[in-house]
Structure formats: C-alpha cells, structure tokens
Amino acid sequence: MKINLLVLTISAVLSITACSNKDQKQTSQQKTESLETENNIQKSDKKMAKPIHLTKAEFLQKVANYEANPDKWVYLGDKPCIIDFYADWCGPCKMVAPILEELAQEYDGQIYIYKVDTEAEMELASDFGIRSIPTLLFCPMGEAPQMAQGALPKDAFKQAINEVLLKKS
C-alpha cells in the first residue's frame, strides 16, 4: 500500500513538473518571439520616414509664425519643406498621399513633408487662402514659398523638390 501511494505521489509530482516546464518553455519562447517582433517593428519604423501632420500651433512653431511676422515670410525650419493642405474626403488628395509618403522616404533627411488637414485646421487654411485642395506649399530655405494646386504626378514633385527646394539643376 505504501509503495502504491509513493508511486502515485512521484508520478503526480513528475507530471505537474513536466507540464509546468512545458508552459515555461512556451512562455519564454513566446516572449522571445514577441521581443523579436517588437524590435523588427521599431527598426522598420525608424527606416520609414512619413509626412508629419501639423496643427496650427505646430505650424507656428515649426514652419512660420505668421502671426508674429505678418508682413514678412520667415521660415523657421532647418530644412526645406512641402506642406500639403488636404482633406480626407478629397479624391485628388488621396492620390497625392502615397506619392508624398514615397517622397518622404526618398528625401529623408533632406526635406520635411508636412500635412495640414483643412477640415481640422480651418483657420490655418483660411489664413493661407486655401480655396481648392490639394494645395501644396513649397518652402525653400531663405526664399519666399511657392504654391501649387491640384494632384501633381511624382516626377513633377521630384522636379520641384530638386529645383525649388534643393536647388539642383
């Protein structure tokens, strides 16, 4: 009887231990996979430059404080930029959005690409006289900005970036 009880106890302890070790192995493997996934996401986020959405307050800090300088354009950025005045419902704006994302990656470190939602930032859009969308404002360093309206093809954007913003012929 004592031998049966001893065998039963040992087998119970072994089965519990075996099951709990299996769970720990799975948990550590899941943690490792989770960390690898997080690291891959963080690495890909660092590589993926994207357009930056601006509010009016951010515009006044990063681009130009036209309230403090109403008579003169003073660009505040350290790199040239493109500002896309858009709306979520606008078909041509939806056509331009992926082009701007590609250009943000292609010209990462050389220019900024900003986006201003005209529905959310009506005052800012009004201050710049935005009547049709998409409207794009090209802001070179040390010069007056240039405005373009409508959905431009990627080569037109690249030409404007190279000639107006980066001064490449």
Question: Where would I find each of the regions flagged by the language model?
Answer:
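A short beta-strand-turn-helix
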Residues: 55-80
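Short pre-active-site segment immediately N-terminal to redox-active cysteine/selenocysteine motifs
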Residues: 78-81, 85-89, 132
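Structural signal for short hydrophobic segments within the conserved structured cores
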Residues: 52, 112-114, 145-148
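C-type cytochrome heme c attachment motif
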Residues: 88-95, 135
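Non-catalytic, surface beta->alpha helical segment in thiol-disulfide oxidoreductase systems
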Residues: 132, 137-169
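Thiol-based oxidoreductase modules, predominantly thioredoxin-like and allied folds used
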Residues: 85, 96-104, 108-123, 130
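Extracytoplasmic/secreted proteins, especially bacterial periplasmic and envelope-associated proteins
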Residues: 54, 58, 81-84, 95, ...
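N-terminal targeting signals for export/organelle localization
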Residues: 1-60, 169
